[in-house]
Amino acid sequence: MRESDEQRAYREQRTDELIWERARTLGMSRKRFLALLASGAGAAAALGLDGRLGAAQAQDHAPHFNQYADWFVKPTPAEYFIDHGHAKEMRWEVMKGRDYTVSNDLFYVQNHFPVPRIDPRAYKLRVHGDAVEREVEFSLDELQKLPSVTLTRAVECGENGRVFFAVQYKKQMDGAQWRLGGIGVAEWTGVPMRAVLERARVKPGARDVMPVGLDGGQDFRNLAARPIPLDKAMADDTLLVYGMNGQDLPPDHGGPVRTLVSGWIGPASIKWTGRVEVSSKVLISIFNTEYGVMIGPDYPPQPPFPGVVCTWQNVKSAFELPMNTVLPSGPQVVSGRSWSGKSNIRKVDVSLDGGKTWEPARLREPNIEKAWVRWDVDWTAVPGNYIFRARATDNLGQTQPDKGPPYNFHGYLYDGVVDHPVRVF
């Protein structure tokens, strides 16, 4: 997957705006500023990447919470999760025969910092910035009194499928070796972000909105934040969430309040959201300049972005089976799920012989956009070794390619058809 027109437009617009803004701040021409960047001398400081940006933009306005606790609060037993240290990947086999949504106890967890223990009674959400007419603050109770919505949406780690880059390029990447279990679908209840932004009276010149979490520090490298464009923040399915699957939002998943940026990579859906900055300028964080960026020969850098910024999730499929599974011979129902960050799924084709033949899978309702669809095929298994493959196409016509995207340093957004080895005895 090379850089799409949409990704390129997003990158070029943000880059151009940031260059103009930084040049004006430093009192120099755009040409002189670009020359400074090209020289490398003082480039980080010129761009505001020297560690002071987050501290300058942030204020100590967090609600009271205890000292950092563990990386995880809920039990994460090995029979349900693959341990990646600071992340817990859902084992796909646990979804066999289960409901459409993933229960809270089975939902994957990816944290950048330990879980803050926040007292819901003391929680405050602050909306501020130079692009709002007034600063506003909400308690949890005040948020819950606003008109709420419940949406079924996926949250998916941008690194989901990373291990298959290693398979494809014969080169292991740093970080958690995610298979395909870095995704979950839940019913999320909350308030459209638009509603709280409207209370703050967003100015006409607003450009970027940046939710900030309470789990990190206040310096640039430790600020748990990810900017999004104003139009994405105002979308109907961008929420400030306080409920998950009919329960209060659990601590592991961002409780008491998190952001949900539907369809985008998981790091955009900031957990433990404590404030939202609205700016007339381009906002940057470590999660759209160093992480959350595809870096490699096929992803041209344009400072401050060293590559292509990850936004929308792509199309993927997974079998509800362990990798390298062993099955008995006889009649089988082979099942799985497929999903897309932009749409719902139109069709899924399945091969049980390594791609020699394909057959359409039966899709099972519901089939919700930006979530997933369940599917299955019948199979009479005889002893031997097999390679299962699944290839989904969404309603926008996006189809999983045979291979994943060009190599990128962090291993983001793998979407290729995955080989799933199976042995029948």
Regions found by a protein language model. Name each.
Residues 26, 32-55:
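N-terminal export signals
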Residues 1-10, 46, 53-62, 425:
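Basic/polar N-terminal segments that are highly enriched at the extreme N-terminus
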Residues 20, 28-30, 50, 89, ...:
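Intrinsically disordered, low-complexity sequence elements enriched in Ser/Thr/Gly/Pro
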Residues 1-32:
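N-terminal secretory signal peptides
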Residues 59-425:
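Structured, non-membrane catalytic/scaffold regions adjacent to prosthetic-group chemistry
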Residues 15-16, 49, 59, 69:
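Intrinsic disorder/low-complexity signal
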